[in-house]
């Protein structure tokens, strides 16, 4: 559809959420916030949920159903709407078709897909590949950057190859479950043991003695067979949002800081899943209280990191600010969009409110179009 045709009506946006990963519930909560903040005067929004088993369903675009209530996490349930599919055929023009009993009936045609999926089977390049095959414009990073950003090992490798500062780490692939002596000496204690391709701090453990490592690896492997062991970095936890504009230029947001010392009365506390989403225990400072010169250096590093993995659309870049300078922890190509998430909060502090932020992402997607870039 041409830009002139779109000017005559609202842009139809499919917000896709849920999915097969262990971050299903957080994806739902992010989608609820996005549905609440998309400008209905400009966008005709439909909601497509993916169940934990992988079925796609057309659901009511009701953000109130996509919230955490009394610590109960939302979920896309089978039978909650009409099952549908997106044919991998660019000639279909973004058509969503029904599965039996109304086999092949066109339910909706969309201009843009907003894949608000966190974790594997969504944020890792898989749905991006499907959307490329279907010839449908979509918000966010492409296949390569999504896959790299999801994999902590390859994120660090690409950033280091581009001369960007990253922390020390080791990778454990099956059947290996222990570190070599030289790796233990290089990393030191404590270390953080994580699923290599996961987010929301699910499956993450802090290890303060090497005899705790096997249990931490086993815990991480409940979510991913590949495990990354990262040296603990002493420093402030800072974040920066990067946003691509419709003309292709990149902007970096005001910084935010996460402070988790003493959460739930534990000296070894860190920003885990419960702290992030259930306990409301961490303190989030936006804007972060950082020297202007240091803040600008971090913003420039965020833009360099964004470019290093060939990212598009948006990303959140996480840092540790140490006595020796900033260190990049990771890049999140589809950051959280919940009411407490740092990405929209940092942009709000930068003068870009939530509806404008979402509109900019969609405008950038439409300007970019489909195909190789």
From Swiss-Prot:
Catalyzed chemical reaction(s): 2 D-alanine + ATP = D-alanyl-D-alanine + ADP + phosphate + H(+)
Single biological process term from Gene Ontology: peptidoglycan biosynthetic process
Compartment(s) of residence: Cytoplasm
Cofactor: Mg(2+); Mn(2+)
Keyword set includes ATP-binding: yes
Cofactor remark: Binds 2 magnesium or manganese ions per subunit.
Domain of life: Bacteria
UniProt entry keywords in alphabetical sequence: ATP-binding, Cell shape, Cell wall biogenesis/degradation, Cytoplasm, Ligase, Magnesium, Manganese, Metal-binding, Nucleotide-binding, Peptidoglycan synthesis
Top EC category: ligase
Involved pathway(s): Cell wall biogenesis; peptidoglycan biosynthesis
Pfam family, one: Dala_Dala_lig_C
Its EC number(s): 6.3.2.4
Start and end residues of each ATP-grasp domain: 156-363
One example GO MF annotation: metal ion binding
Cross-referenced PROSITE patterns: ATP_GRASP (PS50975), DALA_DALA_LIGASE_1 (PS00843), DALA_DALA_LIGASE_2 (PS00844)
Function: Catalyzes the ATP-driven ligation of two D-alanine molecules to form the D-alanyl-D-alanine dipeptide. This molecule is a key building block in peptidoglycan biosynthesis.
Entry-linked PANTHER family: D-ALANINE--D-ALANINE LIGASE, D-ALANINE--D-ALANINE LIGASE A
The family this protein is said to belong to: Belongs to the D-alanine--D-alanine ligase family.
Protein name listed in UniProt: D-alanine--D-alanine ligase
Native species: Mycobacterium tuberculosis (strain ATCC 25618 / H37Rv)
